[in-house]
Amino acid sequence: CEFEGSKKNNIILIPESVAAIKGDPAHTAVFKDANPDCPADARYKCVIVGKPHGLYLLKSADGIRFSVATDKPVITQGAFDSENLAFWDPVRKEYRAYWRTFTAGTTDGKTWAPAGIRAIRTATSKDLLTWDSQADVEYVDSPPQQLYTNQIQPYYRAPHIFMGFPMRYTDRGWSESLMALPGREDRLARAKASPRYGTAITDGLFMTSRDGVQFRRWNEAFLRPGPRRQGSWVYGDNLIFWGMVETASTLGDAPNELSIYAPEDYWQGEAVSFRRLTLRIDGFVSLRAPAQGGELLTKPLVFDGGNLTLNMATSGAGSIQVEIQDAAGKPLPGYTLADCPEIFGDELARVVRWRKGGDVRSLSGKTVRLRFLLHDADLYAFQFVPYQPDPVRPRPGK
């Protein structure tokens, strides 16, 4: 778009380009439509807030030049004053949307009187035009918390699982600890416009779901405000971007990692900074055991595959062992803990090998349980994969 007489910029939308729907470019979410039946001229979509009150859709063939796809709002019940997004669910073959709402009060476009908790609402659609099954997102064993955004997406390595990275909003009020934070004078100046601009702090959370409505939300921050420095510990920072990218590690031949991004310096000058953050693939949470040990017994499960792999990390003295049991909890011959040599290292897909090898094809399709015994170790994920023969190892001293 042209800005101040020049097109040498990265601006995709300006108010004039969405004037027909009185669109707000500050409240948009662009996604590449993964629906295989999506027309080529609408491969990219943009969810945008407009008037009359609601969410509208833009479309584009290249993700750069957008046009209005709906001249009427497709979703009207919500606050929409933050991030609102949609995507194609490849497992359930439908679109799903998540948007900003409040649990009480009125936010209908005519009256702005929000109350209750800043919350997330969701719905599904076959065509992006008619949205059904609207519901507020629910949480298991998590107290009420103010969530500004949602950043929900299917995890690309396990698309049946939804992952979200909402920004948590906490108003700490005026206190000695708040006044000891960096940028005190700026904080006091912002508070003249609105007290919460000085007293609120935001950080990033992590949550997952298998149905898109009921989420397991970890109450501990996934992204903390970090070390004290100028411009930190403010309202608006630590908003994890929507999406993640698999990137090469900077550590030589180490495996790929995940890159996520978040803004910093939200109130510093006229622009914000973006920071890249990295973590191991699947490394969002882990089953962690101390040196004295700990264990996990899974629910009964049925698998398809020939080998069991672990995304795991241990200390030099740590270990993991795996036992396969039948549905009643009886260890299966050849797959007991005693049959499993200690596994140690740090890998994304270590094959579990018992004394007789790693072949589990004879158990495929049967109901089993897995027992994990850990010492000073983390287990991030496990997966059954197609069978590969055991490697031929050299014999020490030969």
Predicted regions and their residues:
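Carbohydrate-active catalytic/glycan-binding domains of CAZyme proteins
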Residues: 1-398
